[in-house]
Curated annotation (Swiss-Prot):
FAD binds at residues 10-15, 122, 177, 366. It is found in: Cytoplasm. NAD-binding protein involved in the addition of a carboxymethylaminomethyl (cmnm) group at the wobble position (U34) of certain tRNAs, forming tRNA-cmnm(5)s(2)U34. NAD(+) binds at residues 269-283. SMART domains: GIDA_assoc_3. GO terms for molecular function: flavin adenine dinucleotide binding. Its cofactor is FAD. HAMAP family: MnmG_GidA. Homodimer. Heterotetramer of two MnmE and two MnmG subunits. Keywords: Cytoplasm, FAD, Flavoprotein, NAD, tRNA processing. This is tRNA uridine 5-carboxymethylaminomethyl modification enzyme MnmG. It comes from Rickettsia canadensis (strain McKiel). Pfam families: GIDA (PF01134), GIDA_C_1st (PF21680), SAM_GIDA_C (PF13932).
C-alpha cells in the first residue's frame, strides 16, 4: 500500500503551492487532482497579480514558491499598477497565456523531487481519535498519511448558475465534490455557502478594436520571480471598452432572470468584484462601467471581458454584449456564470492553517473563504510548509501582520472569519509601507532559508542581492557634491557649504533617480531594482522609522498573553458591548484584542491593568 507523509487534495493555486512546499522540505508528498492537464488552472481571469495581490505573489516567490516563476514563463502583458502613487501601493500584474501557464506548471510539478501526482477523486477522509489517518478514494481504496491539506477551491458541493439553469460542477465540465463536504459536516465544521462568478468568453475575431481604447503594457516587463532574469515571452496589448445606458436597460429589464436576483442564489458574492447586475443595482447613478478586454493567449483568440461577470441567461448575455462599443458583432464562445460552493468558517483553523478540530488536517484557499489565485497560493505555501514541519517535529512557520501580506490575510481570517469572499487590499495592511513588492525577499527569504524551504539556487541569488545592496548603499554614501555645486546644476538645496551624498539627495522632495543619474553617471552601472529599493528607503526613511516603532509595539503586544479563563465581565470600566465582543472573539493576546473592531484603546488599557493586578507576578505577559 502506498503511504505518504503529506497528501494535498486539489491541484489549483493553493494545492500546487502546498504540495511543492511540502516536497521542498524533503517530505514524501502526494498531490491528488481530478485532471492531469488542469494543474494551476486559471478558472476565472487569465492574470496574476494586481494591487496587493502582486505583493502576495512576490512573497510566495520569496519563499521559493511557484506562482511568480510560472507567470514569468507565461506572461504576455506586464503592467505595474498604481505606479503614479506611493510605492506602498504599487501592484505588479501580468496577463497570462493560459496554455503556457498550465504547461509550465505541469512541467515543474511532474519533475519535482519528493512529489508524486495521482489523478483521481477523494470521497472521504479517515479520521480516528480526532486525527487524520488516510484519504479514501472514490474506488474505496485508502492511502495512509500523517497530514492532509484540503485545497478544494469551488468544488465543495459546487453549483453553477446560468439564468435559471443549475449545473452541479466545481468548474465548467468538471464534477463537484460532495463526499468531502459530507465529511466536513459529519466532523462538525461550521459550513456555509459563498458565491463567485465569471464573465462570458468572447471570440476576439468578432471584435471591432477600432472602437476600443488601447491599453499597452510596460515597455520593459519586470519579472515576478527572483529566478527570472528577463521575460522573453512575446508581449501583446489589451483593450478597454465600457457599458452603455442601453446595456444597463437590458440588465434592469432582466434582473428577475439573474440567478443572483431571482432568489435562486442566497450565497454572498465578492464585494469588490461584483457581477455586472450588482454594479447596475448598487451604483445606479453611474452611466457606464469599464470593461477590460484581455486576450487569453498568444495563439488563442478568446477574449476575457473583465468587468461583466454575470449569471444572466445566455440569450440575455448575447443581447447585452452587442450594446457595448466594439462588441456589436461579437460572438460569445462560452456564457458567463455564477458558482456557489461550500466553505468553512476560517476561525476553525489556527494560524498554521491546521484545523482546531482535527489534528493533521489543514485548509488552504477558497475553503477558508478567500477569493483570488494569489490569496489561495499564499495560504497554500504556508499550509504546505507547516504540514511538512509538523511531520518533521519542527516548530511551526508563522507569518505575521508585521512581516507579510500573507500574515495579514491569515490573521484576518483566523481572528475575524469572513461572511463574504475575502480579497487582499493594501488598506488591510497597517504596515504597508514596510511590506512592499520590492522588498518581499528581504522580509521573507531568510526565514525560508532558516527552515529549509528555499532552494540552493535561490539562496545564492538572495545572498548575492544582499551583498550588492550593501555595496551600492556604501557607494551612495560616498558619491557627493557640495551644496553650492548642486545649486548651480539646478538642485534646490540650502547652500550651507556641506556635502550632500546621493542618499541625502534622495530625501529631497520630488528629487528623482533620473536626476541622480544625470549628476552621477556612475549610477547607470547599478542594478535598477537595487537603486530603486535604496531610493525608496531613503525617501521614506522617517516614515519607515516610525512604522518600525509601531511594529515593535505590535510585536510586544503579540506576546502579551490573555488567559483562556479570563472573565471580561469582572473587568471594571469597560462597556457591556466591549465585554460581549471580547467574550465572543476570545483573543489570546493583547495584540489580537486590539485588532477586534470596536475595542477602544481605553478598553485595552483596562485589560492590561486588570491582568497586572490579578497576575501580579507578570505570568500573563510573555510566552517565555
Amino acid at each position: 500500500m502506498l503511504k505518504y507523509d503529506v497528501i494535498v487534495i486539489g491541484g489549483g493555486h493553493a494545492g500546487v503551492e502546498a504540495a511543492a512546499a511540502s516536497a521542498r522540505l524533503g517530505v514524501p508528498t502526494l498531490l491528488i487532482t481530478l485532471k492531469p492537464g488542469n494543474l494551476g488552472e486559471m478558472s476565472c481571469n487569465p492574470a496574476i497579480g494586481g494591487i496587493a495581490k502582486g505583493i502576495l505573489v512576490k512573497e510566495i516567490d520569496a519563499l521559493d514558491g511557484l506562482m511568480g516563476y510560472v507567470i514569468d514563463q507565461a506572461g504576455i502583458h506586464y503592467k505595474m499598477l498604481n505606479e503614479t502613487r506611493g510605492p506602498a501601493v504599487w501592484g505588479p500584474r501580468a496577463q497570462a497565456d493560459r496554455k503556457l501557464y498550465k504547461k509550465a506548471m505541469y512541467q515543474i510539478l511532474t519533475n519535482y523531487p519528493n512529489l508524486n501526482i495521482l489523478y483521481g477523486k477523494v470521497e472521504d477522509i479517515e479520521i480516528k481519535s480526532s486525527k487524520v489517518k488516510a484519504v479514501v478514494l472514490n474506488d474505496g481504496s485508502k492511502i495512509p498519511c500523517q497530514k492532509i491539506i484540503l485545497t478544494t477551491g469551488s468544488f465543495l458541493s459546487g453549483l453553477i448558475h446560468i439564468g435559471s439553469t443549475k449545473i452541479p460542477a466545481g468548474r465548467v465540465d468538471e464534477e463537484a465534490s460532495y463526499g468531502l463536504s459530507n465529511t466536513l459536516k459529519r466532523v462538525g465544521f461550521k459550513i456555509a455557502r459563498l458565491k463567485t462568478g465569471t464573465p462570458p468568453r468572447i471570440d476576439g475575431l468578432t471584435i471591432d478594436y477600432s472602437k476600443t481604447v488601447l491599453q499597452p503594457g510596460d515597455k520593459t516587463p519586470r519579472p515576478f520571480s527572483a529566478l527570472t532574469n528577463i521575460v522573453d515571452v512575446p508581449q501583446i496589448n489589451c483593450f478597454i471598452t465600457k457599458t452603455t445606458s442601453e446595456t444597463h436597460d437590458i440588465i434592469r429589464e432582466n434582473l428577475d432572470k439573474s440567478a443572483m436576483y431571482s432568489g435562486q442564489i442566497e450565497a454572498i458574492g465578492p464585494r469588490y468584484c461584483p457581477s455586472i447586475e450588482d454594479k447596475i443595482v448598487r451604483f445606479s447613478t453611474k452611466s457606464e462601467h469599464r470593461i477590460f478586454l484581455e486576450p487569453e493567449g498568444l495563439d488563442d483568440y478568446t477574449i476575457y471581458p473583465n468587468g461583466i461577470s454575470t449569471s444572466l441567461p445566455e440569450e440575455v448575455q448575447c443581447k447585452l454584449i452587442k450594446t457595448i462599443p466594439g462588441l456589436e458583432k461579437a460572438t460569445i464562445l462560452r456564457p458567463g456564470y455564477a458558482i456557489e460552493y461550500d466553505y468553512v468558517d476560517p476561525r476553525e483553523i489556527s494560524i498554521t492553517l491546521e484545523t482546531k478540530k482535527i489534528m493533521g488536517l489543514y485548509f488552504a484557499g477558497q475553503i477558508n473563504g478567500t477569493t483570488g489565485y494569489e490569496e489561495a497560493a499564499g495560504q497554500g505555501i504556508v499550509a504546505g510548509i507547516n504540514a511538512a514541519l509538523a511531520v518533521k517535529n519542527q516548530p511551526p512557520f508563522i507569518l505575521t501582520r508585521a512581516n507579510s501580506y500573507i500574515g495579514v490575510m491569515i490573521d484576518d481570517l483566523t481572528i475575524f472569519g469572513t461572511k463574504e469572499p475575502y480579497r487582499m487590499f493594501t488598506s488591510r495592511a497597517e504596515y504597508r509601507l514596510s511590506l512592499r513588492a520590492d522588498n518581499a525577499d528581504l522580509r521573507l527569504t531568510e526565514l525560508g532559508i532558516n527552515i529549509g524551504v528555499v532552494s540552493k539556487k535561490r539562496k545564492e541569488i538572495f545572498k548575492k542581492k544582499c551583498y550588492n545592496i550593501e555595496k551600492t548603499r556604501n557607494l551612495l554614501k560616498t558619491l557627493s557634491f557640495t551644496t553650492s555645486k548642486l545649486v548651480k546644476i539646478g538642485v534646490q538645496v540650502a547652500q550651507d557649504g556641506t556635502y550632500k551624498t546621493v542618499l541625502d539627495l534622495f530625501k529631497i522632495p520630488n528629487f528623482t533617480i533620473e536626476q541622480a543619474i544625470k549628476i552621477f553617471p556612475k549610477l547607470q552601472e547599478i542594478n535598477s531594482n537595487i537603486l530603486q529599493l535604496l531610493y525608496i528607503e531613503a525617501k521614506y526613511a522617517s516614515y519607515l522609522a516610525k512604522q518600525q516603532a509601531d511594529i515593535n509595539l505590535f510585536q510586544n503586544e503579540e506576546i502579551q498573553l490573555i488567559p483562556k479563563n479570563i472573565d471580561y465581565f469582572k473587568i471594571p470600566s469597560i462597556s457591556l458591548e466591549i465585554r460581549e465582543k471580547l467574550s465572543y472573539y476570545k483573543p489570546t493576546t493583547i495584540g489580537i484584542a486590539r485588532r477586534i473592531p470596536g475595542i477602544t484603546p481605553a478598553a485595552i488599557t483596562a485589560i492590561i491593568i486588570y491582568l497586572k493586578t490579578k497576575y501580579n507576578d507578570g505570568s500573563f505577559i510573555s510566552n517565555n
